Amino acid sequence: GFLYKDNIYFSHYATAWQIFKDYPVAGVGLKNFRAYCSDPAYLDKVYPGYRNINCTTHPHNLYYEILSELGILGAIIFFSFFVYFFYICLKRSYEQSNMFLYGNTLFLMTYFIPFLPRGSFFTNWNAIIFWTIFTISFYLLNKKETHA
């Protein structure tokens, strides 16, 4: 359809998928998508209309970024950590009636909505926002209640 052929992000997704297929276990390393996407081998593997726009600093999608740069092993560790973190945060926010922790957790979870184009998870202003709120949530999760 028109969304696939006219959307520049699909060129990045296709390239990231090809990189993942070539390096499925451990990926190419954090922030190395930019080094591999310009390889001529990937130009031949993507949709012909994307051959001149397939390379950028990151794939613009969290899942493709993690798979291409960290591979299956890294993706399992990465996503397991966040699933566990979100579970603990939601559980504690319910037990303590902490709406601030609950809201922060829901906000952080929106970063994991599939198929949304995003900046790099590790290196841009989106990352600054995510990691700042993550740190606040982590603090709230470990904060000891003080009684006056």
Segments the model singles out, each with a brief description of its role:
Residues 2-14, 26-70:
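Long extracytoplasmic/lumenal interhelical loops at the membrane interface
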Residues 15, 36, 62, 66-72, ...:
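Generic recognition of well-ordered alpha-helical segments
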Residues 20:
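Conserved short C-terminal alpha-helix that flanks the catalytic cleft of nucleotide-sugar-dependent
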Residues 30-32, 74-77, 122:
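Short, flexible micro-motifs
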Residues 42, 89-97, 121, 145:
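Membrane-interfacial segments
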Residues 69-112:
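Hydrophobic transmembrane alpha-helices and their immediate junctions
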Residues 104-148:
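Transmembrane alpha-helices of multi-pass inner-membrane enzymes
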